[in-house]
């Protein structure tokens, strides 16, 4: 992460703010918010452990940019443009139309979920994160064919899952009690990533406090 796009490019001093320092700062803020929410939850649900909520949000926040390619959104556009080219089209011949769309509209958030759950050389289950952590990480719980071009709600244009990872996310949703979203925009559309992660962690720990915090998924 340290050598990826700087959040503030071309600094005029020696204070370099990279994706690594950005992610560490977001994780720190997330941990504090998670602890605050966890304490509030504990007032209503005695079996909620505030530190669990804090750890879930911190882990999700630390990983929130892990799927971003070099050069950030410009890198996403470059990958998508390649797969829309004649040469890229040939590389996609064996895929379904939905799988092709995943790459023609490449999204770092979807790649991040894939990295966390699959792309680990010595494991078929990625980083073995808990269901609650993966639920909190997933900012845009939809595939590319479900993303909508809604100018009033920019986040609805994004997707956070590839077709190959839908079953894994279904397991995450089932373990954590996440509900299928209605089609109309919700109140969380324009909230920050840390706030969304905190809400997801809150929903998860409230639904099944002891189970989802410890449950690790197996990827088929």
How would you label these PLM feature ranges?
Residues 1-3, 13, 24-29, 33-59, ...:
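Sequence-structural signature of the catalytic-core scaffold of metal-dependent phosphohydrolases
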Residues 188-219:
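N-terminal, intrinsically disordered, basic low-complexity segments enriched in Arg/Pro/Ser/Thr
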């Amino acid at each position: 992460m340290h050598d990826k796009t700087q959040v503030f490019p071309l600094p005029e001093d020696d204070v370099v703010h990279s994706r690594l320092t950005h992610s560490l700062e977001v994780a720190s803020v997330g941990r504090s918010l998670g602890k605050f929410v966890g304490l509030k939850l504990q007032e209503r649900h005695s079996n909620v452990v505030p530190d669990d909520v804090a750890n879930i949000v911190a882990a999700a926040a630390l990983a929130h940019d892990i799927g971003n390619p070099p050069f950030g959104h410009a890198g996403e556009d470059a990958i998508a443009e390649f797969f829309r080219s004649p040469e890229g089209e040939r590389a996609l011949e064996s895929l379904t139309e939905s799988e092709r769309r995943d790459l023609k509209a490449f999204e770092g958030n979807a790649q991040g979920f894939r990295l966390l759950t699959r792309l680990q050389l010595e494991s078929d289950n990625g980083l073995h994160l808990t269901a609650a952590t993966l639920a909190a990480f997933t900012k845009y719980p939809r595939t590319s064919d479900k993303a909508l071009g809604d100018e009033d709600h920019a986040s609805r244009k994004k997707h956070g899952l590839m077709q190959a990872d839908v079953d894994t996310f279904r397991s995450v949703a089932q373990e954590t009690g996440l509900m299928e979203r209605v089609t109309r925009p919700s109140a969380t559309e324009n909230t920050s990533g840390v706030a969304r992660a905190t809400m997801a962690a809150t929903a998860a720990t409230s639904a099944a406090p002891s189970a989802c915090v410890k449950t690790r998924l197996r990827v088929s």
